[in-house]
Amino acid sequence: MSSGLDLQPRPVPGPVPAWAFPAGVAGRVPAGPATLRCDLPGRRLAAVRLVLHAGAGREPVLADGRRLDGVATLTAHALAEGTEPGGGTALAAAFERLGASFFAHADLTALRVALDVPVTRLPAALELFAEVVRRPALDDADVRRLVRERLEEIAQEDADPGTRAMRELRAVMFPPQARASRPTGGTPESVDALQGSDVRAFYGSVVPAEATAVVAGDLSGVDVDGALTAAFEGWAATGDPLPDPDRTMPDSTARIVVVDRPGSVQTYLAFGHGVPDRSHHDWPSLAVAAHVLGGGLTSRLNAKLREEKGYTYGMRAGLLRMRHCGLFVAQGAVHTEVTADAVSDALAELRGLASDGIDADEHGASVRALADRAPAEYETARAVAAELADVSANGLGSDYPSAYLAAVRASTPDGVARTYRRHVDPEALTVIAVGDAEKISEPLEQLGYATVTVTAGEKEKE
């Protein structure tokens, strides 16, 4: 029976509008950091990102052999305490009066200090921002309070199986002397030993001339160069040079490591393999390959383990970025009783991309997902500034985002498959399983992929 409704045909998506990543204008503050100014008309919230080459990869080892693991993260937290002992609340209030927000964090590569503020108040906010980064208190009492808070954060991180799996993956793939083998934010033992003097010495060794200050937003009518010069001119290091960044490469070998969590009803799985860093011409194709495998609900890992087998709520795959290398990682949680089956099926999919290649449809879908989302992904000044800060921290140049997107679009199914085969050996994967060792170790051993070793979870270690 006809409804009599005259339905209009479904709209057909039009072509993707031409778009290019915003270009920045490079400069330098006299006797200070490099600058990168990016004018984004209509973005009335400005974003400032100061990149200091003082990440966890440059944390020193003292003469007595004590490693200052976690001092970069603790320093980032301590900057938010302001220029006076116990001044964190007053500093937050001062930024709030300007409608601004201030935060900082550290990773292996860099310590990044951030400011978001309406463009009309950018000069005043930059003045306050400069006071904080040039003359922070880094007070003993504040640092010890932050140590206690950081220890609580570490305990929370240990309770998360995904975080625990990634930490174990790095610990296994990198040798113990490599900084990347240990938690970026430090261990409970290393963090508990940190004092205010350690934080002050570390921050005093920062070389401002090696830093980069990125400013993005609608900068019309704002003397950004003048404000940056007033903020940072003459800023100099006061301490001994930091050690060179650690560049130890990962070891890609077939192994299965079980992190024991007795009674766990799920197993968190992580599959890892070393790949080149982002400066390598194969990185964009590796990103496409990772997306084909685990970039969405229709990806190969999800189609098999979620949709067909019902083992998991979702798997994902991607590239872990470090300055000197990368890691291909596939991960997700599965039911305990199907752990070995899930590993077997995941390995089959990881092998299948190498042996069978990629078809045009899934390649096209992944390219569109990675490249066509860029206009929305970089809609805000915050996103643009964060990306420019990241490429600066990794020595890639401000034209890298555009070159990366162009390379993704120019990739081909055969080229992506060849790149994957060149850099990812499915027979040399590190497999981490965070779960009940009593229930999953023997089935994993029976797979015959690699010898299974068991390490205690945090509660057992205590």
Where are these regions (language model features)?
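Charge-rich, well-structured scaffold segments of protease-associated domains
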Residues: 1-12, 90-241, 308-310, 314-462
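N- or domain-start disorder-to-order transition segments that initiate the globular core
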Residues: 2-47
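Extracytoplasmic/periplasmic mature domains of Sec-exported, cell-envelope-associated bacterial proteins
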Residues: 7-9, 13-19, 48-54, 62, ...
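Short, surface-exposed beta-strand/loop micro-motifs that present aromatic residues
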Residues: 26-27, 34-39, 200-203, 254-260, ...
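Extracellular/periplasmic catalytic domains that process cell-envelope and extracellular macromolecules
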Residues: 29, 42, 206-207, 262, ...
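His/Glu-based metal-binding/catalytic segments typifying zinc-dependent metallopeptidases
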Residues: 35-56, 61, 67-71, 240-298, ...
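M16/MPP (pitrilysin/insulinase) zinc-metallopeptidase core fold and M16-derived inactive scaffolds
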Residues: 49-119, 182, 295-311
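Short, conserved active-site entrance elements at the starts or edges of catalytic domains
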Residues: 229, 247-248, 303-304
